[in-house]
Curated annotation (Swiss-Prot):
InterPro entries in UniProt: Archaeal_FAD_synthase, Cyt_trans-like, FAD_synth_RibL, Rossmann-like_a/b/a_fold
Pathway: Cofactor biosynthesis; FAD biosynthesis; FAD from FMN: step 1/1
Binding residues annotated for ATP, in chain numbering: 5-6, 10-13, 92, 119
UniProt xrefs under NCBIfam families: cyt_tran_rel
Source organism of the structure: Methanothermus fervidus (strain ATCC 43054 / DSM 2088 / JCM 10308 / V24 S)
Family: Belongs to the archaeal FAD synthase family.
One Pfam short name: CTP_transf_like
First-tier enzyme category under EC: transferase
EC number: 2.7.7.2
Xref: SUPFAM superfamilies: Nucleotidylyl transferase (SSF52374)
GO MF terms, alphabetically ordered: ATP binding; FMN adenylyltransferase activity
Role played: Catalyzes the transfer of the AMP portion of ATP to flavin mononucleotide (FMN) to produce flavin adenine dinucleotide (FAD) coenzyme.
Protein name: FAD synthase
């Protein structure tokens, strides 16, 4: 299982999802949980792309077998429903692996938590970097869009 906002898709997302799927082995199935707009606003910032569109795009990505919107409020409800063998965390996700593992154990969810390393092959390797670059650009020919 992989989770995330997936607001403006970039190569780091592809790397994360590919590595998450590889964790499960040859015939693994990757289920992706896309964060709800309310969750993104509470934890990060207002999303650029709404949750339904983000989900639609994630479903189209090659490593993804299934994708769903997360539950409002208790993020563990989705995990309890899916019962993954592995939860792959992205490098920028603010979960502490040990605390997450403790909470999973408390809820009788037997799965491994693995942090995927950072993707640094692209200067625009995060949604925030993309947003900052767009804000800095002067679009003299915006009418052509």
């Amino acid at each position: 299982m992989a989770t995330g906002t997936f607001d403006i898709i970039h190569p780091g997302h592809g790397f994360y999802l590919k590595k998450a799927k590889e964790l499960g082995g040859k015939n693994s199935k990757l289920v992706v949980i896309v964060a709800r707009d309310s969750t993104v606003r509470a934890r990060k910032r207002k999303p650029v792309i709404n949750e339904k569109q983000r989900l639609e795009v994630v479903k189209m990505l090659k490593p993804v077998d299934e994708a769903y919107l997360g539950c409002e409020g208790d993020i563990f409800k989705t995990v309890e429903k899916i019962k993954p063998d592995i939860i792959a965390l992205g490098p920028d996700q603010d979960f502490d692996e040990k605390e997450l593992q403790k909470e999973l154990k408390k809820r009788n969810i037997d799965c491994k938590v693995v942090r995927i390393k950072e993707y640094k092959k692209s200067p625009l390797d995060s949604t925030c970097k993309i947003i900052k670059k767009i804000k800095q650009m002067k679009f003299d020919d915006i009418e052509k869009c």
